[in-house]
């Protein structure tokens, strides 16, 4: 059971989400790189976009296959430059985090080939961290692809409390898994020009 696959599609969500590799030359799912802020993207199976981050990004939520996600379209002074897909994770299921990363990475690799870079760091719950014997299982997974002019990065930062229970000391937001497509050609922010006023004359001070 591939939880990332659309019904009737043998590839995973990455394939169904991004389309053919050459699409990235133009934009993301038909939304062109450099499109100015104010244009509204439209993705199937997603909610209506809403502005966030002081209106410099659009956010929508929905499902990719069976996975709940939030998708952000982010704009710079040069226009649309990044899509960030944030996966919903079970805060107490460490193994499901690793499995989901592997599934998405596999789907991306079917489209773009093996990752250009990979990084894997895991740490089991060692020792006693406080008086109630709480520890943490941790994993940092990262893979990236270079699909010129676009960069693709997949990141998992998993931190799960052990022993598992319904009450997490640090809440349910310690783990994240994000998939990012970005075009460095549009990562441009206009520099604010600061006009410095000359210091007051010594005669004005004294």
List PLM regions with ranges:
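Mid-chain, structured segments of secreted extracytoplasmic proteins
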Residues: 55-102
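Non-cytosolic coordination micro-motifs
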Residues: 3-54, 90-206
């Amino acid at each position: 059971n591939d939880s990332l696959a659309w019904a009737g599609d043998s590839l995973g969500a990455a394939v169904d989400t991004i389309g053919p590799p050459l699409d990235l030359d133009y934009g993301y799912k038909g939304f062109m790189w450099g499109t100015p802020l104010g244009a509204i993207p439209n993705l199937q199976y997603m909610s209506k976009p809403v502005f966030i981050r002081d209106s410099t990004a659009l956010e929508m939520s929905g499902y990719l296959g069976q996975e709940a996600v939030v998708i952000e379209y982010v704009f710079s002074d040069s226009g649309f430059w990044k899509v960030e897909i944030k996966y919903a994770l079970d805060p107490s299921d460490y193994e499901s985090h690793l499995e989901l990363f592997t599934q998405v990475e596999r789907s991306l690799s079917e489209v773009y080939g093996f990752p250009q870079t990979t990084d894997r760091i895991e740490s089991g719950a060692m020792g006693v961290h406080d008086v109630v014997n709480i520890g943490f299982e941790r994993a940092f997974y990262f893979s990236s692809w270079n699909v010129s002019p676009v960069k693709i990065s997949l990141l998992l930062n998993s931190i799960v409390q052990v022993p598992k229970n319904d009450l997490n000391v640090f809440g349910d937001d310690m783990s994240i898994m994000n998939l990012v497509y970005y075009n460095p050609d549009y990562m441009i922010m206009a520099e604010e020009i600061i006009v410095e006023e000359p210091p007051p004359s010594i005669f004005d001070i004294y």
